[in-house]
A protein has these predicted regions:
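Short acidic/polar capping segments at secondary-structure boundaries
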Residues: 78, 119-121, 144
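Metallo-beta-lactamase
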Residues: 1-102, 110-122
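Active-site flanking residues adjacent to catalytic metal/cofactor-binding acidic residues
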Residues: 73, 117, 146-147
Length: 148
């Protein structure tokens, strides 16, 4: 099921969603239509939406399995969170991410480490989940690793 095999290490992409984000002009300072025209043969329709002109980004984690540990790199957007700047992420109720993690053969209790590359909302959202009105760790047996 691994997307990549590096020796005896398996790496699997765990997708939460494909999301339209911003236009190339909004994201890249100085980006011009001519720059887009030079690359539209491979950007359309999978990386840029033909209808909106927005970039299509995979919101995903990487599941890393070694002989000794099960590691999750980033935890996507999550559910029941409040986001003012990305309305589509506000108060989501979709458990696709957890279902995809289980489809990859891992239960949240089996994660040993969660590596957070940085603390943007689309990288740490599933660090916690709402359960019976309380925020609890989604990966209760994991050690969470952050940079200083």
């Amino acid at each position: 099921m691994a997307d990549w095999q590096l020796g005896d290490i398996e790496v699997t992409s765990v997708l939460e969603q494909m999301a339209e984000f911003m236009t190339l002009e909004e994201f890249f300072d100085g980006f011009t239509p001519e720059m887009f025209d030079a690359h539209k043969d491979w950007l359309l329709p999978n990386a840029v939406s033909p209808s909106s002109g927005k970039m299509i980004l995979p919101i995903q984690s990487y599941l890393v399995r070694t002989k000794h540990h099960t590691i999750l790199i980033d935890t996507c957007v999550g559910c029941h969170k409040k986001f003012k700047w990305v309305p589509d992420w506000n108060d989501r109720r979709d458990d696709t991410y957890l279902r995809n993690l289980k489809a990859a053969g891992v239960d949240p209790t089996e994660i040993d480490y969660v590596f957070c590359t940085h603390l943007h909302v689309d990288h740490c959202g599933w660090n916690t989940k709402l359960e019976d009105g309380r925020w609890v760790p989604t990966f209760p047996n994991a050690k969470y690793i952050f940079s200083q």
